[in-house]
């Protein structure tokens, strides 16, 4: 379609009286946001109704105007819910589409609705209302995931697995303890969500374009109607602030990073080289060429989508970094990254909350893996320290023993007491080691010995789960 073709008569736009020629069709499509900001329809109606109620209370519009506006908005809401509302590209955005339809339905009362406000404070209000509802939904789903982790952790509070550093076997832990680490991560995410909601739950409406309005408005009344905790204190900041959208995307980036770390482990654990878990078929897919394949697409996609959410954050930061006060058209570009982050986080949390309870744990495989790689070597060093040896000397002694076992292709528990003393270079100090050492060299003994708050002992894991359920 030719970029020089003009498709609009000036009168079609709310701002057209200033202009002498119609908008170029390509410009119209380039500048319109109705393709994506339809999502604001219900919160836009809610904001308009609250604004109209305040205008009537302040005698800025009549009671009849308010009644007409309420009646018209009810019909518009029904049309939207039924999929019968006709969105028009020529009207640019959700705000002017609804206002035009309202005026068509109720006449002059519809024209009075915009008294004392601008699309600048209107869209800022819509953004906060929409994001607040989204945050509340995400909070519920995040809680479901946290409960799922608690339930699985409780079931496997005594299931032994290898703990890793550098992806090398480090020390025995329990699977329940491992899951509780993710519970802690997601709990911090939940706390961040509460904090950011409290920060942005303030009303921009009343700031108008940027300087406020000459009408005797009552912003506090509108804030109460819409459930805000208060009003934005500066009209310039009210219309230009997008910190809340950036902060949500920052929260989302951290949360998705946690999801991605869990996803990476699920992918590893599901691989034949680990074989620690299995996932139900409904959370996996196959291959179009390899008949045997069962691919963990859900956690793999979650890893991939994490980068996408990072991109949403960078988009918003870049969008805002060079804007002078107050509102600029750049801010039309704030919505799609925010929508994408909300959708991605919500979908990811929902599927993980559904998937986590159905993780099939192969406890015997996990325990066997924990018994490899000299996972209890640190326990032997601690044992020697408790017998009176300095830690660095104990560390060196056990390192010699491990090296000897590697050369003999055996484990520490395969050695006799005399052989273990000799391997540690302690055969001349028999008082430092007796038969009780072997109980500590088992993975069960190692795990049970971590009897302190935050430790991996099953009793401590269960205590942590109990505290977590109380906090929830």
Curated annotation (Swiss-Prot):
The identity of this protein, by name, is Argininosuccinate lyase
Gene assigned in the entry: argH
Q: Is Lyase given among the entry's keywords?
A: yes
The family database entries (InterPro entries) matched by this protein are listed as: Arg_succ_lyase_C (IPR029419), Argininosuccinate_lyase (IPR009049), Fumarase/histidase_N (IPR024083), Fumarate_lyase_CS (IPR020557), Fumarate_lyase_fam (IPR000362), Fumarate_lyase_N (IPR022761), L-Aspartase-like (IPR008948)
Q: Which UniProt key words apply to this protein? A: Amino-acid biosynthesis, Arginine biosynthesis, Cytoplasm, Lyase
UniProt-listed CDD domains: Argininosuccinate_lyase
Q: Please give the family membership noted in the entry.
A: Belongs to the lyase 1 family. Argininosuccinate lyase subfamily.
Q: Which GO molecular function annotations are given, in alphabetical order?
A: argininosuccinate lyase activity
Which reaction equations make up its catalytic activity? 2-(N(omega)-L-arginino)succinate = fumarate + L-arginine
Q: Does the keyword Translocase apply?
A: no
What GO cellular component term, any one, is given?
cytosol
Identify the metabolic or biological route this protein is part of. Answer: Amino-acid biosynthesis; L-arginine biosynthesis; L-arginine from L-ornithine and carbamoyl phosphate: step 3/3
Output the SUPFAM superfamilies linked to this UniProt entry: L-aspartase-like
Which PROSITE patterns is this protein grouped with?
FUMARATE_LYASES
Q: Which compartment or compartments is the protein found in? A: Cytoplasm
Q: What class of enzyme is it?
A: lyase
The source organism is Polynucleobacter asymbioticus (strain DSM 18221 / CIP 109841 / QLW-P1DMWA-1)
Q: What is the lineage of its organism?
A: Bacteria, Pseudomonadati, Pseudomonadota, Betaproteobacteria, Burkholderiales
Entry EC no(s) = 4.3.2.1
GO biological process, any: arginine biosynthetic process via ornithine
């Amino acid at each position: 379609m030719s970029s020089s073709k003009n498709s609009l008569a000036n009168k079609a736009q709310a701002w057209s009286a200033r202009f002498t020629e119609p908008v170029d069709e390509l410009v119209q499509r380039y500048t319109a946001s109705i393709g994506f900001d339809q999502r604001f329809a219900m919160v836009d109606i809610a904001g308009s109704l609250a604004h109209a109620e305040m205008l009537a209370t302040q005698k800025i519009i009549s009671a009849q105007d308010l009644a007409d506006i309420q009646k018209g908005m009810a019909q518009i809401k029904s049309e939207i819910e039924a999929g019968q509302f006709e969105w028009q590209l020529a009207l640019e955005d959700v705000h002017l589409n609804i206002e035009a339809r309202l005026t068509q339905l109720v006449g002059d009362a519809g024209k009075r609705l915009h008294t004392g406000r601008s699309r600048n404070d209107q869209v800022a209000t819509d953004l906060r209302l929409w994001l607040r509802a989204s945050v509340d939904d995400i909070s519920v789903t995040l809680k479901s995931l946290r409960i799922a982790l608690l339930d699985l952790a409780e079931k496997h509070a005594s299931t032994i697995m290898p703990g890793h550093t550098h992806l090398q076997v480090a020390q025995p832990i329990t699977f329940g303890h491992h899951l509780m680490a993710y519970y802690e991560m997601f709990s911090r995410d939940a706390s961040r969500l509460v904090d950011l909601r409290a920060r942005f739950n303030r009303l921009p409406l009343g700031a108008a374009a940027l300087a406020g309005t000459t009408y005797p408005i009552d912003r506090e009344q509108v804030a109460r109607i819409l459930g805000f905790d208060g009003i934005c204190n500066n009209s310039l900041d009210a219309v230009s602030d997008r910190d809340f959208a950036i902060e949500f995307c920052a929260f989302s980036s951290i949360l998705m990073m946690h999801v991605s770390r869990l996803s990476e482990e699920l992918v590893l654990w599901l691989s034949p080289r680990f074989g620690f878990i299995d996932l139900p078929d409904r959370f996996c897919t196959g291959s179009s060429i390899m008949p045997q394949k069962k691919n963990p697409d859900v956690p793999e996609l979650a890893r991939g989508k994490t980068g996408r959410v990072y991109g949403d954050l960078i988009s918003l930061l870049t969008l805002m970094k060079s804007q002078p006060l107050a509102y600029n058209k750049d801010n039309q570009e704030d919505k799609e990254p925010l929508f994408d982050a909300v959708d991605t986080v919500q979908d990811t949390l929902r599927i993980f909350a559904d998937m986590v309870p159905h993780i099939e744990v192969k406890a015997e495989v996990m325990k066997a893996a924990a018994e490899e790689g000299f996972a209890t070597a640190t326990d032997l060093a601690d044992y020697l320290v408790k017998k009176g040896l300095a830690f660095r000397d104990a560390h060196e002694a056990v390192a010699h023993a491990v090296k000897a076992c590697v050369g003999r292709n055996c484990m520490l528990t395969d050695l006799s007491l005399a052989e273990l003393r000799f391997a540690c270079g302690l055969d001349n100090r028999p008082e430092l080691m007796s038969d009780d050492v072997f109980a500590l060299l088992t993975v069960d003994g190692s795990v049970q010995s971590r009897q302190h708050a935050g430790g991996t002992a099953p009793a401590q894991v269960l205590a942590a789960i109990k505290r977590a359920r109380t906090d929830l």
